[in-house]
Swiss-Prot record:
Keywords: DNA-binding, Metal-binding, Nucleus, Receptor, Transcription, Transcription regulation, Zinc, Zinc-finger. Pfam families: Hormone_recep, zf-C4. This is Nuclear hormone receptor family member nhr-51. Residues 98-337 form the NR LBD domain. A zinc finger (NR C4-type) spans 5-25, 41-60. The keyword Isomerase does not apply. Belongs to the nuclear hormone receptor family. GO terms for cellular component: nucleus. Its main location: nucleus. It is found in: Nucleus. The keyword Transcription regulation applies.
Length: 371
């Protein structure tokens, strides 16, 4: 480079702090800024005006740097809170992308096979999946089957599930598939700006035979299709809140006394992780009301459990009254019979709110589930 430094007129080495300058002037400016140095000129701050010999006045040299346009661009160290927020942001983006892919595969897939929950957990490729023909009519029961399969595939992609035993995973999925399906279906209904649950293709979730069976108590069917949706509408639940809540509810460590200690501890640690992320997200989006909002969102589990219990009752009554109808085995294992694992499961946070530690993430100190 044949150009001269704009500060001292010696040979320039490049652009430093926004100004063509030499290394000496670069390091001088750097020290002045980093060490917060201050000097005074004894000659009226005019040492760098028409000089022949390079002046030794540091005050005027620094003033010349500023006049030529040097600006400090200090490297900003992210605070703990900022680093945590970025992690949560990336987590939410990843969860949303995974859920969108799951939903797309469910909408565009079809299968006539009939594996059990155990079959799918042993070999995820046991079921032959084909691309759904555009003219393929899908019944409500088939949608339930495809939804269950998509959820097993979806949650199996989480790394923490890989280390859990087959027996524990079977308990976890048999308990959670219907509940997560009800939650997602109601959230989908909210996004579609409707107030009553329908299948993805827009049909009634119950066939005429079920309506005839419950013609004297239509309120039960209406409750299963509308109660959770109305609550989501009331709370204006966002997609980010939904993504985290799904995992908080899925990672329930007390769904069964038959769960191993390892599985229970794994679920509990991840429930804390996603609960912490949700609370921090609410602190950003709902400053001042995050604790109240958090409790409102967590209380959705009671509505989900009530709707789930009602759906199980409808399914079992339908099976008893019309025994000739054959449920897909995957639906039976996770829908009709899932109540066998645990008939009642109500979530309650024991008088504790997430608390902030100056050096740790927001966590639950007592995050327990009571039956």
């Amino acid at each position: 480079m044949n150009k001269n430094c704009l500060i001292c007129h010696r040979k320039a080495a490049g652009q430093h702090y926004g100004v063509l300058s030499c290394f000496a002037c670069k390091m001088f400016f750097h020290r002045m800024v980093v060490e917060n140095l201050h000097y005074c000129c004894q000659k009226f701050n005019k040492c760098y005006e028409k000089f022949i010999i390079l002046p030794k006045c540091k005050a005027c040299r620094y003033q010349k740097c500023l006049e030529m346009g040097m600006q400090a661009f200090p490297r900003r160290v992210k605070s703990f809170e900022e680093s945590m927020d970025l992690k949560i942001q990336r987590m939410l983006m990843n969860l949303s992308e995974m859920d969108e892919q799951r939903h797309w595969r469910m909408l565009n897939s079809y299968s006539i096979e009939d594996p059990s929950l155990g079959d799918v957990l042993v070999d995820s490729n046991v079921m032959k999946i084909m691309r759904k023909p555009s003219n393929q009519k899908v019944t409500a029961h088939e949608w339930a089957f495809l939804d269950v399969y998509s959820r097993i595939s979806h949650f199996s992609n989480f790394e923490f599930m890989n280390n859990i035993s087959f027996a524990d995973r079977k308990l976890i999925f048999s308990f959670n598939c219907l509940r997560t399906g009800v939650f997602h279906g109601s959230m989908r209904t909210l996004r579609e700006q409707r107030d009553c649950l329908l299948t993805p293709s827009g049909e009634d979730v119950y066939p005429d035979a079920v309506h005839n069976l419950f013609k004297d108590s239509p309120g039960l069917l209406n409750r299963t299709c509308c109660l959770l949706v109305s609550k989501l509408i009331e709370l204006k639940v966002t997609n980010e809140e939904y993504q985290l809540l799904s995992l908080i509810f899925f990672c329930n460590p007390t769904i069964s006394h038959n769960l191993s200690d390892f599985a229970r501890n794994t679920l509990a640690s991840h429930q804390i992780k996603y609960s912490s992320a949700l609370f921090r997200h609410l602190q950003i989006t709902n400053p001042g009301t995050a604790p109240v909002r958090f409790q409102e969102l967590i209380s959705l589990v009671h509505v989900i459990n009530r709707v789930t219990n009602d759906m199980q009752h409808v399914s079992m009554m339908f099976q008893c009254m019309i025994p000739s109808f054959k449920f897909k085995q995957l639906v039976t294992d996770t829908f009709v019979d899932c109540g066998v694992v645990q008939k009642k499961s109500n979530v309650k946070i024991l008088n504790e709110k997430p608390c902030a530690d100056s050096s740790q993430d927001f966590i639950f100190h007592k995050n327990k589930f009571i039956h």
